[in-house]
């Protein structure tokens, strides 16, 4: 067996991916400067030099999101993990959540709600059209006990963009916090987290940021974090529990070890 493993290792070729111009719904082309940055020497995720870079990364993400939210950070996993970070922390068993579906990723939001024990109230629009503000307003009036409004800002599956500013205003008028999918929209279209009073938002580095896949920028305001801190039940995911992650990524945190961050990916 040992000789077979050795033979396999000797015959394996280094992978040389073909050069492509990426035009699909997945990753975008990555600039050579970013690829070069990821090839730099690996240092520890608690190294003072890396901690300094973490602070710079947070500030850069704040600018892109147009926010001063203290908890603005990159989740060490792709955009789907950013989505789960929002729902795992903000949805408790029995919570009623109004979720807008006008494409694939609204459907994924609904699945997250049910997996975390929430009750999904669906507002459905035709694929390729924007989320109807009138339908959302009616759904919230019909469900005054709803705690969250969740919607996709720009649906990757169709390209349809919805009025995030108006939807957030409707949510707050009905005492709901908002979860916004900005995987496709961040850095690609106007997005103002603070001005539009978005409570929780997630994105991905592989779309309009034209960076490597595998990182999910997220941002939470104080209204969202208050709900996280006041949960009656523990967050079901240890890895995504913001109460733990804030010790590493939170503003003024001691950078307490939680998990090994993807150091070289964050260089990019």
PLM region spans:
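Conserved active-site segment immediately N-terminal to the catalytic lysine
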Residues: 193-206, 216
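Active-site C-terminal subdomain of aminotransferase-like
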Residues: 29-30, 206-268
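A glycine-/small-polar-enriched, mobile loop at the entrance of the PLP active site in fold-type I
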Residues: 19-76, 80
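Basic/polar N-terminal segments that are highly enriched at the extreme N-terminus
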Residues: 1-17
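Conserved beta-loop-alpha segment that forms the PLP phosphate-binding cup at the N-terminus of a helix
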Residues: 68-98, 102, 106-111
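Active-site phosphate-binding strand-loop segment of PLP-dependent enzymes
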Residues: 131-187, 200, 208
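General beta-strand structural signal in soluble alpha/beta enzymes
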Residues: 22-24, 73-76, 99, 122-123, ...
């Amino acid at each position: 067996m040992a000789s077979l493993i050795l033979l396999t290792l000797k015959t394996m070729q280094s992978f040389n991916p073909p050069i492509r111009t990426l035009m699909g719904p997945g990753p975008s082309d990555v600039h050579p400067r970013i690829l070069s940055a990821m090839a730099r020497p690996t240092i520890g995720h608690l190294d003072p030099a890396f901690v300094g870079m973490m602070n710079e990364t947070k500030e850069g993400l704040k600018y892109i999101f147009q926010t001063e939210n203290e908890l603005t950070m990159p989740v060490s996993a792709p955009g789907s993990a950013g989505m789960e970070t929002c729902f795992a922390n903000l949805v408790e068993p029995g919570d009623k959540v109004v979720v807008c579906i006008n494409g694939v990723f609204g459907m994924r939001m609904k699945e997250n709600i049910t997996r975390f024990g929430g009750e999904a109230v669906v507002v459905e629009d035709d694929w390729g059209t924007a989320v109807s503000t009138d339908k959302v307003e009616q759904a919230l009036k019909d469900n005054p006990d709803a705690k969250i409004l969740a919607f996709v800002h720009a649906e990757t599956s169709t390209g349809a963009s919805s009025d995030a500013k108006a939807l957030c205003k409707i949510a707050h008028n009905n005492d709901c916090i908002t979860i916004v999918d900005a995987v496709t929209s961040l850095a690609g279209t106007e997005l103002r987290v603070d001005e539009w009073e978005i409570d929780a938002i997630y994105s991905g580095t592989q779309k309009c940021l034209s960076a490597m896949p595998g990182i999910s920028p997220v941002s939470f305001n104080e209204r969202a974090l208050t709900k996280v801190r006041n949960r009656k039940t523990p967050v079901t995911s240890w890895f995504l529990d913001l109460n733990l992650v804030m010790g590493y990524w939170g503003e003024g945190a001691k950078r307490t070890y939680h998990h090994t961050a993807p150091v070289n990916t964050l260089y990019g």
